[in-house]
Swiss-Prot record:
Compartments where located: Nucleus
Top-level lineage group: Eukaryota
GO terms assigned for molecular function: DNA binding; DNA-binding transcription factor activity; zinc ion binding
Pfam families attached to this UniProt entry: Zn_ribbon_Dof (PF02701)
Organism: Zea mays
Zinc finger (Dof-type): 60-114
PROSITE patterns according to UniProt: ZF_DOF_1 (PS01361), ZF_DOF_2 (PS50884)
Name under which the protein is recorded: Dof zinc finger protein PBF
Major localization class: nucleus
Functional note: Transcription factor that binds specifically to a 5'-AA[AG]G-3' consensus core sequence. May enhance the DNA binding of the bZIP transcription factor Opaque-2 to O2 binding site elements.
């Protein structure tokens, strides 16, 4: 029995001085039980009691706006001689018995400020997310289609001749394009059998093929040399002829093409000079034969003259006079 009582006494006695102080002080016990209450204690006055509100017969007037819609808020620095009031009309604070500060109207509410900032921040975030949101595949496809359509509108139509080209070449294009069955163009040399074929996109790929034949010399230049001007620069040994097969109503049209100066002065409108005449002959096997003479200083299909219109007229007049003198 004595040993049991001794053990219980040993367990009940504190092990050190700190535990004895904690058990003896009732304040520490209350703090251990309710820590929130102990944190709120410094907000009360130094004596541990809540200070009473000032008892006034009527509400104080606001020194700024003279409004009676005021209320007591708190004591400044826990001093009862400095009560702090708030005016609900102009939403400003002041201390009774103290000096007034230059405070703007409506600057005393913190809750509204925080709420407005939060609303503003959410609005800006939503707007930014809306602006930087990734595009859906449908919007990407529509935008790409719009860009492709814009580029296609800028590219000229290659299948149909534009009004400007038809205005520049009113008589050249109809003669080069077959009217009956259509078809491509094949420019072939007789001796070397070199051809340059191309098919216009606006014409079908069926029908007779026109021929460009050059004769009169054994050493025929190549087509590139012809383009550079080897055969079209007034050489009298070559006699070029364009044989073009028509479709249903072909006819012989021997004429000499106008000079470069005449084409420039007339704007390529199809008007010719005196020597560039167009004579319509009888039908011959449904073929339209266009021949160019050498009297015009080597006028040919690709009429690459670099002289002016007046110089060509003078040369033509001189040639006609020489022919008349020879005939006499």
């Amino acid at each position: 029995m004595d040993m049991i009582s001794g053990s219980t006494a040993a367990t009940s006695t504190p092990h050190n001085n700190q535990q004895a102080v904690m058990l003896s002080s009732p304040i520490i016990k209350e703090e251990a039980r309710d820590p929130k209450q102990t944190r709120a204690m410094p907000q009360i006055g130094g004596s541990g009691e809540r200070k009473p509100r000032p008892q006034l017969p009527e509400a104080l007037k606001c020194p700024r706006c003279d409004s009676n819609n005021t209320k007591f808020c708190y004591y400044n620095n826990y001093s009862m001689s400095q009560p702090r009031y708030f005016c609900k009309a102009c939403r400003r604070y002041w201390t009774h018995g103290g000096t007034l500060r230059n405070v703007p109207i409506g600057g005393g509410c913190r809750k509204n400020k925080h709420a407005s900032r939060f609303v503003l921040g959410s609005h800006t975030s939503s707007s930014s997310s809306a602006t930087y949101a990734p595009l859906s595949p449908s919007t990407n496809a529509s935008s790409s289609n719009m860009s492709i359509n814009k580029h296609m509108m800028m590219v000229p139509n290659m299948t149909m001749p534009t009004p400007t080209t038809m205005g520049l070449f009113p008589n050249v294009l109809p003669t080069l394009m077959p009217t009956g069955g259509g078809g491509g163009f094949d420019f072939t040399m007789d001796n070397q059998h070199r051809s340059l074929s191309f098919t216009p996109m606006s014409l079908p790929s069926q029908g007779p093929v026109p021929m460009l034949a050059a004769g009169g010399s054994e050493a025929t230049p190549s087509f590139l040399e012809m383009l550079r001007g080897g055969i079209f620069h007034g050489s009298s040994s070559y006699n070029t002829s364009l044989t073009m097969s028509g479709g249903n109503n072909g006819m012989d049209k021997p004429f000499s093409l106008p000079s470069y100066g005449a084409m420039c002065t007339n704007g390529l409108s199809g008007s010719t000079t005196n020597d560039a005449r167009q004579l319509v002959g009888p039908q011959q096997d449904n073929k339209a034969i266009m021949k160019s003479s050498n009297n015009n200083n080597g006028v040919s299909l690709l009429n690459l003259y670099w002289n002016k219109h007046n110089n060509n007229n003078n040369n033509n007049n001189n040639n006609n006079n020489n022919n008349n003198n020879k005939g006499q």
